[in-house]
Amino acid sequence: MNGTEGENFYIPFSNKTGLARSPFEYPQYYLAEPWKYSVLAAYMFFLILVGFPVNFLTLFVTVQHKKLRTPLNYILLNLAVANLFMVLFGFTLTMYSSMNGYFVFGPTMCNFEGFFATLGGEMSLWSLVVLAIERYIVICKPMGNFRFGSTHAYMGVAFTWFMALSCAAPPLVGWSRYLPEGMQCSCGPDYYTLNPNFNNESFVIYMFLVHFIIPFIVIFFCYGRLLCTVKEAAAAQQESASTQKAEKEVTRMVVLMVIGFLVCWVPYASVAFYIFTHQGSDFGATFMTVPAFFAKTSALYNPIIYILMNKQFRNCMITTLCCGKNPLGDEDSGASTSKTEVSSVSTSQVSPA
């Protein structure tokens, strides 16, 4: 083994030199230079500084504006709650630990931070899956003129919580475990060892199949079918400038959604699976740290893609921030945009509203 394993940690550094120390007790500057920890702390501070206001404002604006409290928007609120979990219970601990060069809060808080970071990340992931399914049902109409109501929205939110808990809770009860990862300043599931006492192998396979491959397939299928539907509607109305504009806007939004998903999860899943399938191989601490923080950044760019680029949400936010007046003069334009005459596909339905 080219790393050092303890009771509740795994350090990607051999202890042949005697330098390796518990990441709960000593700075880990033998893994990376101190300036890298400072950069990490500054980056987490940036995510907190921007991510908290954006996600909190989403919830506040929805309370202020009744027209936003629609079934199709419930999952967006769930996404904001998921991001706040990551910001409040994950990013804050990681920032302070990075300032000290190790996870200063101990093994119990490592479980706490790992649980809430995983819970928030998984809630966010499955919220994107539910959003994709919602858009597919509403726009592609595979079930005919299906009316999406509050009951369906509540079921979608409950589903995201169930799936998130099915991933975040097992390490707390003995199926895998939470360990400091990367530069040892944040915690996540154990991809690093095949410790039979925790059945790590089966848990990692379960996570990769159920919590990455399945969401990947569902999101690509739903948005692929959505694009086909929009293009077919546009082709049937080639003379309509509004239809062509709607097609371009919907295509842009779908591309951004898919890119956001790929940037967030593919690096993390790929590196984690590589480490798991190459037990004992050499890898640096930053090898796992960088992909993990791509995933954490989703708390910032998911709200930008799904909420701030939504015209209805954006106008309501501007109105709230400007004390009830929208200086852009678009207060009533957020209800619906660019509907096609045949399919009733709108940018607001996709982006979502």
From Swiss-Prot:
The modification N6-(retinylidene)lysine is found at residue 296. Disulfide bonds join 110-187. One of its GO terms (cellular component) is photoreceptor disc membrane. The record marks 113 as: Plays an important role in the conformation switch to the active conformation. Residues 336-353 have a biased composition (Low complexity). GO terms for biological process: absorption of visible light; G protein-coupled opsin signaling pathway; visual perception. PANTHER family: OPSIN. Photoreceptor required for image-forming vision at low light intensity. While most salt water fish species use retinal as chromophore, most freshwater fish use 3-dehydroretinal, or a mixture of retinal and 3-dehydroretinal. Light-induced isomerization of 11-cis to all-trans retinal triggers a conformational change that activates signaling via G-proteins. Subsequent receptor phosphorylation mediates displacement of the bound G-protein alpha subunit by arrestin and terminates signaling. This is Rhodopsin. It comes from Petromyzon marinus.
